[in-house]
């Protein structure tokens, strides 16, 4: 059986999911979550936590597709953050940790780069200056790069 040639390239063929095990970003207020995962349904482990306004985390990445996997929680209010790719502060991406459903927390993926030129990128995520006291912290699960 011979398959026909692909119509389009598979942009995610070599995707990597980066957690505290695979990458060491620059932490400025964010902290690594080193709690041991207790099974495949124990999702919110091995990521990074931001709690206070101005906390930031910076990644040096290479790829043409980048996604941010974070927790949207039903434990509202939750901290919000913003992502800035390659210093483009005119076009930040909002990462809202508040989940509008009531069935449980959500592993949400926010694409920040899709089918662009493959090159080195800087991704900075910063906790916004919202009222953070008494809120659920921002939980960054992973960065997905292809």
Q: What annotation goes with each model-predicted range?
A:
Residues 1-146:
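Conserved catalytic region of serine esterases and O-acyltransferases that act on ester linkages
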């Amino acid at each position: 059986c011979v398959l026909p040639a692909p119509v389009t390239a598979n942009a995610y063929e070599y995707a990597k999911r980066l957690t505290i095990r695979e990458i060491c970003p620059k932490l400025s207020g964010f902290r690594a979550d080193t709690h041991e995962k207790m099974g495949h349904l124990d999702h919110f482990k091995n990521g990074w936590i931001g709690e206070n306004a101005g906390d930031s985390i910076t990644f040096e990445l290479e790829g043409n597709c980048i996604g941010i996997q974070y927790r949207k929680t039903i434990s509202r209010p939750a901290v919000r953050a913003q992502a800035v790719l390659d210093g483009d502060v005119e076009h930040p991406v909002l990462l809202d940790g508040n989940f509008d459903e009531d069935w449980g927390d959500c592993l949400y993926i926010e694409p920040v780069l899709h089918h662009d030129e493959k090159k080195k990128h800087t991704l900075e995520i910063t906790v916004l200056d919202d009222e953070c006291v008494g809120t659920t912290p921002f939980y960054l699960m992973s960065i997905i790069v292809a």
